[in-house]
C-alpha cells in the first residue's frame, strides 16, 4: 500500500509538471542499464520520488557496443517504455570523446590498435591512451582512449549511434564531458590535441602551424589565443552536430551535456566552455561541488568538506550558471559525502540539497564520487518528496525586480582567470553579505538587463562590440555603470588596447558612470578568505576594515541601489531576492557554523528580518516555507506600504513569498 501511495504522489506531481518542459523539474540519480534490472530502477524512481531517470549503458563509449549496439539499443527502448508507463522520463548516459576497450591486454582488437590515428596526441606525438589506475572508472587491463573530434570516420559512426539511440524513444541523451585531454596526470598542460587531423583543421582555418608556430601556454602569444579559441569552437561544432542528428529523429529528445569544471581557466584548457555550450545544449549538468579552504573552481570537493565561504562561492557559481542558462534548466552533479568520519551523510546531503533548491538548480543524488546510488536513501526520499511538493515555487522562472547587475565576462574568465575569479567572486560576496538583490548579466543578456546599477568588475577583456553596447546603455541614461580595476585594457582577442578608452567613456558620461581605480572585489575576497569562515564557525559578525576601493563601491551602492526587499541579519546566509509569478520571493540558505570534516549541522538562524517595500496591497500575506517543512503564514508590521516580518528560527533554509 505504501509503495502505491508513493507512486500516486509522484504521478500527481508529474501530471502537474507535464504542461511545462520536464527537464526543468528533474530530481535524479544514476542507474546501470540492462534488460533485467529495469524493474528495479523503476521501483527506485517511484519510491524515492525521482523525476527524470538516468540510466547508463554507454553505446559509443565502449568499443564492443560502438561496433555493435544491438543489445544495448533494445535495453534503452525497454527503459524508455517503462519510464513512460509510469508517466516519468528517462535519459541515457554516453561518453563524449572517450572510449574504453575491455580486457585490452588480451584482446586482439582494441580501439587504439585498430585506429591509432583517431586518438588525441600531445605536442610530442604521444597518444592519449590510459589504463587502470589513471582514473577510478578505468578497470585494470582496460584501454582508455581519447578521440579527436576531427577523426571524421569515427564521427560518422558516432552520429549514427546518436540517431539510433534517439529512435528508441528515450527522452534524452546525456553526454559526458566532450573535452580535449588536459585532465589526467601528465596531461594537464598539454593543450592537446596535436594529432594530424586537428593540426590540419587548425591550419586550414587560421593558416597557423600548431606544431611550430604556437607557444603553448603563453597567453601573450596571439597564435596561442587562436589555438585556444579554435579548440573551444571545435567542441561546440561537435556538440552542434550531435544535436542536429538527435533532432532529425525526434525533436523532443533532449541533449544533456555534462561539463566540468565551471568558472576558471580550465574551460579554455579543456575546450568545453559552458557559456558557449548553453546556446546549443537543451540542458547542462555541472559536475561542480562545494570546496574547502582551497576555494578554487569547484571541480572537486564535496559537501562534507566545505566551509561557509566555500558554500557561498558554490552558490555564486550556481547563480552564474543559471544566468548563462537563461530559459534553460541547470542540473548539478555535486557530491555530498566521501566517508568523512565525523559527518553524518544525511546532514551533508541536506546541506547540498538546500543550496541547490535556493539557487533554482536541479539535484542529482549520488553515492560518494560516482553518479549512481545514494549516501542515504531515506534522506533522498525525504528531500525529493519536499521538492516534489514545492517544485513550482522552486523551478518557476525567477525574475529580477530592482537588482544590482554584475557583469560576467567569459573572455576575461578564460584569459585572466586568477584575477577575474578574485574580482568576480569578491564583488558577488559583497552583495551576498549586504543582502542586496543581484542580477548576473552576460554578453547575451546585456541589452535586456533590468538592473539600474551595473557593476563591471575588472573585466580586462572587453570587445568593441561589447563596449559599444555599454555606451548605448549609457546614452539611454537608464543605468549607472561602475567600472573597476583594469576593465577594458584588452580586446576580445586579448590584444592590449588604449588603456584610456574606459576613462574616456566615463568622462563622456559623467552622470551615469563611476570609475574605481582599484578593484574592490579582489580586496573584499581577500578579506573574506582571511576571516569569514572563522567568524561563521562561531556565528559572529565579521567587521570589514574598509579599503578605499570598497568605500567607493559602498558609496555608489547606497546612492544608486533602490531595493524592493531589504534583509537584515543572517551573516552566514546566502539569499536571492526575486519575483516569481509576479510575487516578491526570497530564497535563503544558512551555512552558519558549518566546518569542513567537523560539523555539518548549521547553527539555527534566529535574528533575521525582511522588509517588502512599496507593496501595492496592504493585505499581502507572507508565506514562510522552511526547508523540509510545511508552509506557515507570518504576521508583520506595516509602515505605509512597507511590510516587515521577523523570521522564526530556521535551520538550513527557507523560502518566503507573498500571497494576496
Region spans (language model):
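Hydrophobic faces of well-ordered beta-strands that scaffold small-molecule active sites
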Residues: 27-31, 53-55, 90-93, 173-175, ...
